Amino acid sequence: MTNKQINTFFSLSLAGILALVFSTGIKESTAAAFRIEGHNMIVDQAGRILTIDKPFKRIISLYGAHTENLFNLGLDNEIIGVSRHETYPPQALQKSVFSYREDPEKFLAVRPDLVIIRPMIDRGYPQFVSMLEKNGIKVISLQPGNIEDMYTYWEILGILSGKQQQALKMVSRFKAAVSDFKSLTDAQAAKKRVYFEAIHNKMKTFTPDSMAIFALETAGGINIATDAEPVRNTNIAYYGKERILSRSREIDVYLAQSGAMNKPTVKLITNEPGFKTIKAVADRQIYTIDEQIVSRPTMRLLDGIYQIGTILYPEDFNEKSLEILNGAKNPLWNE
């Protein structure tokens, strides 16, 4: 690579990163709404138009949620590569690993017919994406930010993989389970009020339309941070210690997501200066939950709903709730 090419590469990459960092206003997931047109045309979040004449058979997934959903639809051999951060399902860990930070030649060598990315890759690594497309590889960029988008996203994955019926089944099963979970707490006269922490050291929560808050509310919880302002292009929201403490007596349960972006402990939250005035802290009602089951657009959101429900209303989330969860998660291809 010549010096000129190197400079061009870094200029393009920097431009993409700056666009990511300084973009404001609409959430990443809805900056350019993806959609299905007709029975086989897809418009992704970058505005690409893909007409699907036949299912893709050699797919590389560069986001864990894409990978998980493809496996859930019944794919396996069709998935020839995954990202570096896969954790679920176990079969994903047996696949070849790829990264958008690597030389595109590694991708070209295995001849994928589709690479599924998300918007941050589109914006931050445009030269990588362009190289794939110039070599005839289809690229599609998807990342839903709310539940309604998630349903469309699942249907798109079904069209791409030839698993449309399984995708529709995923949607109907998920909706049915959500309805059944909600019915478990209908009789609760006093619903639990919850502060749901997204990032502890920044005192951030989730936007009201995020998947995490959807999981909380489906389990019968009341989000006390409905006035939280979104951080640019994400489902994370500013809140701040002052506002948390101003509502300290209202917080029955303090819930925190745990994972790569947040590593809270009960001790850390308890010892946060000022937090001992929070009702949930005084009552020892502090809990953590895996971010992958409350923030990712997969069927495992039902696990998140179930776990939150067992925290808030253990008397209501009993054997019946486990039946709801297990029924929804039966393999789609068993029907």
Cite the ranges covered by each PLM segment:
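Basic- and aromatic-lined ligand-binding clefts that recognize polyanionic substrates
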Residues: 58-70, 166-219, 226, 234, ...
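Bacterial N-terminal signal peptides that target proteins for export
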Residues: 2-14
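His/Asp/Glu-enriched short active-site or ligand-binding loop at hydrolase and phosphoryl-transfer sites
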Residues: 83-86, 213-235, 255-258, 287-288
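Structured C-terminal subdomain patch of bacterial secreted/periplasmic proteins
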Residues: 34-36, 58, 147-159, 168, ...
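Flexible loop/hinge segments that line or gate small-molecule binding clefts
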Residues: 85-87, 122, 129-156, 160
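Bacterial N-terminal signal peptides
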Residues: 11-23
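Proline-aspartate-enriched helix->loop->beta-strand connector
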Residues: 99, 103-120, 137, 240-258
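A short, structured surface patch at a secondary-structure boundary
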Residues: 58-110, 114-123, 224
